[in-house]
Amino acid sequence: MKNYIEIVDVYARQILDSRCNPTVEVEVELEDGTVGVAAVPSGASTGAFEAVELRDGDKSKYLGKGVLKAVDNVNTIIADELVGMNVLDQVAIDKTMIELDGTDNKAKLGANAMLGVSLACAKAAANFLGMSLYQYIGGVNAKVLPVPMMNIINGGKHADNNVDLQEFMIMPAGAPSFSEALRMCSEVYHALKSTLKSQGYDTGVGDEGGFAPNLKSNEEAIIVIIEAIKKAGYTPGKDIFIALDPASSEIFEDGKYNLAGEGRVLTPEEMANYYVELAEKYPIISIEDGMAEEDWDGWKILTEKIGKKVQLVGDDLFVTNTERLAKGIKLGVANSILIKLNQIGTLTETLNAIEMAERAGYTAVVSHRSGETEDTTIADLVVAVNAGQIKTGAPARSERVAKYNQLLRIEEELNDMGEYRGLKAFYNINK
């Protein structure tokens, strides 16, 4: 088998994501005609320390959100350097782009430009070798199907309602397989829709396919989800668990947390106690961004209070960045990292963050963004690294369902070799 195959063309274009905003798509062609294509996602609530998503800023086109500058960077600066390189050397490709950019946060070329190229190269390499992407990235031991962390009620920046916390999710950790987990979530989703309708609530959906009703409180969202779980014939806390993403950086003002929908302003200590109360009342298995990205003291309080029994995921806190993750590990805050490819900008750096987390006993949850495309890379990535958990929205809206359908295909391909770990995926807590 050849271990060297040249890149002969790198080409980017502007396409639309699921939120009707432009994003970058990249094609990489090899000397034998093999092609790899990747599209880049985009977030609505973004961490302050994420790599830069390069936008044009021309208000007369796409309200300033065009990505033609990033596209041009791919078609000129990046292409000029990568053409002739070996597509099978992912580390060298990503290192070359990082050096070309020369900034700490990808501000020159744009993380959206670099990620599109990085992923398209990996896909082209996998296609050339005749391998599935998860096998190419993960090797012979890539086999773990993830527990879905499925967003079924949206609030915060993902919806136009009065719910402060951004995401209320279900996790079918009691399922025997991924396909059964997906079925369970689908049935709960339908049960939730009928439950909301019966209580007079709107069943319009948010960016990620979850319902976005004007509930009376954040706690009511949990209560109505538990009703739906039971209505679908499952047991909360045994078959299906609750996960939250408050996106607390979005409600952090002057050192306190503003739950405007409930008319409450809480100190970090009070916010931690708020989560403690919720975790004692309901089967909550995971809380993402429970504290703001720079509230390290609040994170420490929260971790000390419930970090042994609830997965505490750092998203804005860590932004898939090994430097921030290393700080968190040293301080003993959180016990899990959310992995978003476009927060850091290359596949290599993403894999480094996952490896660092797992070595420290932290779990890694591979995630979509609110602005998605039909690209299914994260489905392959989560299996490649045996992460065991994926967050990619409700079982509705085709850009979300595309990832779940790809996981069904992977499960089928792995057959008896595939493994669904369920509760064992939460090795960072006592469950």
From Swiss-Prot:
InterPro entries: Enolase, Enolase-like_C_sf, Enolase-like_N, Enolase_C, Enolase_CS, Enolase_N. Its cofactor is Mg(2+). It is found in: Cytoplasm; Secreted; Cell surface. It is an enzyme of class 4 (lyase). GO terms for biological process: glycolytic process. One of its GO terms (molecular function) is magnesium ion binding. Its EC number is 4.2.1.11. GO terms for cellular component: cell surface; extracellular region; phosphopyruvate hydratase complex. Keywords: Cytoplasm, Glycolysis, Lyase, Magnesium, Metal-binding, Secreted. It catalyses: (2R)-2-phosphoglycerate = phosphoenolpyruvate + H2O. Belongs to the enolase family. This is Enolase.
